[in-house]
Each structure stands twice: as C-alpha cells, then as structure tokens.
Amino acid sequence: FIAGLHHQDIVWTTEFMFNALRARYTEQSLYKYYLHNTSVSRLNRQGNKNLNYQRHYIKITRLLEKLNRNYADKITIYPEFHQQITYEALRVCHAVRKEPDIITRQRMIAEIFTSGMYKRLITNVRSVKVGYQALLWSFRLWQWRDKTRSHHRITRSAFNLR
C-alpha cells in the first residue's frame, strides 16, 4: 500500500485482478462498507482540502496507467481497465465543477493539465458514451482555465514554489 493515499482499494483491486488466475462473479456480498457521518468519503470539501483530496484521484489515474503498462505484456488488458482510468479522471472533473472557490478551481484545472491527467482522460476512452463525456470535459476545462498564466505557473503557486 502507498502511505497516505485515499481509496487504495481502487489500485489494489485492479492489481489483484491482474494477478488472479481465475475470476468469477458472485451475487454474495463478501464485505460491507460502513459509511458513517465522519467518513473520509462523505466529507464536504472546499478550497485547499478539496484540492488535496483530488490529488489522490490524480495519483490513482497515474498508478492505474502504470499498472496497465506493466502488465500489458503478461495479460490481456481489457477495455474496462483503460476505461477505469477515464472514470477516475472524470471524478476530478466533476469536483472542479462543484468547487465554489475560483482560485482553487484554477489550481485544480492547472494540476489536471500539469500532471498529465488530461491526456490520460482522453487516451483511455474505450466507448462512445465515455468518449463524449471526456471530450465534453476536456473542452470545458480548456475554456475554464486561467488564460492569463500558464498552467505550470498556477501549479507552482498551488505548491507555494517560486
């Protein structure tokens, strides 16, 4: 496991499936999530807390893409494994839309472009429906970005770098 990374089950489950010799679907519930009011998944985040939380999903997209690359010569990488990367990237896009603070929104958009998640969003599309959503979001992000400064400069200011 990666220390400090939220939602590690996403990456863990994917790697588990890559290493499984056989897989079978069952209706039986093997475990239950207990979501309480103070759960990490249910917290309403705004501003820097939201930005930091979305960085986890950006990192998850990077890790999933790395897994797909590492296992490409060992197993068949089905379209669903690629599309999972796009789904996680779309989560970040929806968080951008919901962010009320305009400065934080610009930082999130800048990190999407700087981290390469923008490319992962598009290159891992494997269906028409998700392709439409990815193109729509890439157009929105391109329109919403801060056009007065480069995305690298905005990201550096998010990390308080000179």
Please state what every model-predicted region is.
Residues 19, 67, 81, 95:
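Active-site catalytic microenvironments for nucleophilic, acid-base chemistry
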Residues 76-83, 106-107:
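Short, charged, amphipathic alpha-helical segments
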Residues 80-94:
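Amphipathic alpha-helical repeat scaffolds of TPR domains
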Residues 1-46:
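Conserved nucleotide-sugar donor-binding catalytic segment
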Residues 95-162:
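Membrane-interface aromatic/basic loop that binds lipid-linked glycans or pyrophosphate carriers
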Residues 30-37, 43-72, 91, 98-118:
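Catalytic core of nucleotide-sugar-dependent glycosyltransferases
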Residues 21, 25, 73-74, 100-101:
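Alpha-helical structural elements of signaling/regulatory helical domains
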